Amino acid sequence: MTVPQYPDKHEASALITPDRGDESDDENDRLLRSPDLPSAVVLTFQPELFEHVVAERVAEQIDDVGGLFSLYRLGDHPDVGVAGDFGIGAPITAMVAEQLAAGGVERFCIAGIAGCLQREVGMGEPVVCTRALRDEGVSHHYVEPGRWATADEAMVQRCETAVEEADLPVHRGPTWTTSAVYRETIPEIERYADEGILTVDMEAAALFAVAEYRDVEAGALFTVSDYLGPDEWDPRFDATDDHLQNLFDVAVSALS
């Protein structure tokens, strides 16, 4: 069995697209079509980070974006927005990116947590994602079959530069994107660690695939939330708040 199961899907047109939201009177179906959107958006998944950014960065809420997510413009970087309040995972990330791209957003960057497969990546040290192993489902509906979804190279370079300018160590490499947190098996962890994959996340492959399909730029930055090895799981979620805030600053610099 392959995904998608319908042959030649990638050559077919979709019935529903983000642009059609203007035709709906339902508030939750009204998609973005605003000339006032920022050109770049940081996607956030942890509520504490989103709340901190909104409170501390003198952010201005952008109304009229429907009910799927919240969007703010940063007071100190008005060309950059932050999206949040939409949960986690590949499907919702794809929908948010679709709607923002339809509204004119040209660049995206994830600022989030990820499990780490390599102990040499220290807590608080940003990981610049170069590509994502497509172990979720969404990416397969956007681009042709393949093992990887790739970050935009220009975004990767901007992220690396932003990390260096923040005087932080740079870790550059692939992530493993999965939608099944409780099925991250020991053989998979061993194999992907041996391949040099740095992290495991839930969104990057979907974002990269949507970006390729919609011809926009996308990157991803991660900070370590836990370590996964064949013999143990080492959770560090309680130590990520400050690291996420630093990572957000790096993402904003990369998008500015």
Residue spans for each PLM region:
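Non-catalytic positions within long, well-ordered alpha-helices that form the structural scaffold/packing
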Residues: 100-102, 193, 212
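His/Asp/Glu-rich mid-to-C-terminal helical/loop segments that flank catalytic regions of hydrolases
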Residues: 228-256
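Metabolite-binding pocket within alpha/beta catalytic cores that recognizes anionic/polar moieties
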Residues: 1-158
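Short acidic/polar active-site loop segments enriched in Thr and Asp
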Residues: 106-107, 198, 217
